[in-house]
Design a protein with these regions (language model features):
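N-terminal secretory signal peptides that target proteins for export/translocation
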Residues: 1-14
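N-terminal twin-arginine translocation
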Residues: 9, 27-30
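Bacterial N-terminal signal peptides
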Residues: 15-28
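Sec/Tat signal peptide C-region and signal peptidase I cleavage site
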Residues: 31-35
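Cationic-aromatic interfacial patches
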Residues: 36-130, 135
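Surface-exposed, glycine-biased beta-strand/turn segments
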Residues: 45, 127-241
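Contiguous, well-folded functional domains in the mature portion of proteins
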Residues: 88-121, 128-134, 138, 233-267, ...
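Catalytic cores of peptidoglycan-degrading enzymes
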Residues: 186-318
């Protein structure tokens, strides 16, 4: 059949629409959420069908009946859930969310995530999802630092070990309420780019531990802001990380900020997104001025940039 000008335009418009729909479907398929129907009107979803070392997953429980209790297990740890701040509509009566951290050294494999719910009225519903964790691709870098940070003397080593015990105690503390509200932000204003998370480091020729934070090279004195609302639980000089601030955001979520030239925060301060915590510097084990920004999620080391990505429809932290 021959096509006149009008029909030809309609033909190409239809082809374009079909192509656009195909592209949209492909995009949604590439970022599909993982979903499980648990029965009794309860569903469990994860923000990705599989993941890699050092990443963060958002979990969501939706229920047609109000929930009296939600408990969850991941990596042999409890995962606290919070009630969604936006009131559910339609057939959904309750929405709860939780964050799952995949440690940067967690072996690749398939792991179970289990959520137990108790509906109003007493019925118990169990949800289970298997999560495929793939190996991350982390580069190796060689750095030269002051000898004392690779081969510390007995006094320096004792100090570093004592600080490690204190840090573990901080990260083991789970504040039962959510202190943050909304998306997290990058701690620096401007076009600073963060990198180096997970890199395997060789320090002065000696193998070191994987890099557990994101580095932002920036001039000394650049203001560093809190990524979200929380409470300052540490603000002092530490042996390896120099002038350091740690913020507790509740529910086992901590951000930490290292190598400051100056600390402007104090333990006990309540800070909001954008509050100045200190200024970029080169204290501790460094090769130059930069911000080391880290994220701990229920005592797992996660790429801090992951929490910034969790915004938008379906992935909000409201």
């Amino acid at each position: 059949m021959r096509l006149d000008g009008h029909n030809l335009r309609r033909h190409f418009l239809a082809r374009a629409i079909i192509g656009a729909v195909g592209l949209i479907c492909a995009l949604f398929s590439a970022t599909a959420m993982r979903a499980e129907d648990c029965g009794s009107g309860v569903t469990l979803t994860l923000s990705a069908p599989e993941t890699t070392q050092g990443t963060l997953l958002l979990s969501e429980i939706r229920s047609a009946t109000e929930l009296d209790e939600v408990t969850a297990k991941w990596n042999d740890r409890d995962v606290p859930f919070w009630r969604n701040s936006q009131k559910p509509t339609g057939p959904i009566a309750d929405i709860r969310k939780g964050l799952l951290g995949v440690d940067l050294e967690k072996p690749a494999g398939v792991y179970d995530f289990t959520v137990a719910t108790r509906l109003k009225g007493g019925e118990h519903v169990i949800c289970r999802l298997s999560v495929n964790v793939r190996e991350g691709h982390f580069e190796t870098e060689s750095l030269t630092v002051k000898k004392q940070f690779v081969e510390p003397n007995p006094e320096q080593e004792a100090r570093a070990q004592a600080e490690a015990v204190r840090l573990k105690a901080i990260y083991d503390t789970l504040t039962p309420e959510r202190l943050w509200n909304g998306p997290f932000r990058i701690p620096l204003d401007g076009e600073f780019k963060g990198s180096n998370f997970g890199k395997r480091r060789v320090l002065n020729g000696h193998p070191g531990s994987p890099h557990g934070g994101v580095d932002f090279p920036a001039p000394t004195g650049t203001p560093v802001h809190a990524a979200q609302k929380g409470r300052v639980v540490l603000a002092e000089e530490l042996y390896f990380s120099g002038n350091t601030v740690i913020v507790d955001h509740g529910l086992g979520i901590y951000t930490f900020y290292c190598h400051f030239s100056e600390i402007d925060a104090h333990v006990g301060d309540t800070v909001g997104p954008g509050t100045v915590l200190g200024k970029v510097g080169a204290t501790g084990r460094v090769t130059g001025p930069h911000l080391h920004w880290g994220l701990e999620v229920q005592h797992t080391r996660v790429n801090a940039l992951e929490v910034v990505k969790l915004r938008g429809i379906g992935n909000d932290l409201q």
